[in-house]
Amino acid sequence: MLEQNIKKVLYSEEEIIVKTKELGAQLTKDYAGKNPLLVGVLKGSVPFMAELMKHIDTHIEIDFMVVSSYHGGTTSSGEVKILKDVDTNIENRDVIFIEDIIDTGRTLKYLRDMFKYRQANSVRIATLFDKPEGRVVDIDADYVCYKVPNEFIVGFGLDYAENYRNLPYVGVLKEDVYSK
């Protein structure tokens, strides 16, 4: 049923898991003995973060934030709103934001700057997908699984109007679905 709205599959579940394992190995190496705090940016980060955690072989803690700059549409409103903040004190902590996709970059730039202000020891960004063509602010992720074209993609946590997050793969949504 959902597949009928997908123009093409970009990455299969198996391909995503392979990249996530590679990233987990890199984070294990980079954070050995440091107990970093992984902060998932809800809701889209859930499948990626759940898969990634299985492949990090060092102590970690997790927390979550609900942050929005889209408010249900396909384009960023430009205004970042924190709907749920972390519960963990991040002062002197190594923080890794876990995100499904970086598009405009507004949300993660805002969060990175805020956590630096709150005196985190370090702030890094790990994203499943990076869409550099969509960037409107100067920010880059420290860890990127895939760079993607400037197309509207869904699946593996990525949504359109809260739908399609449950697809096990990532695909391009047909334009007629979101241009109605």
From Swiss-Prot:
Stretches assigned to coiled coil: none
UniProt: diphosphate binding residues: K43, G44, R165
Residues reported to bind Mg(2+): E99, D100
Example of a GO biological process term: GMP salvage
Active site: D103
Keyword hit for Metal-binding: yes
Protein name, as recorded: Hypoxanthine-guanine phosphoribosyltransferase
Gene: hpt
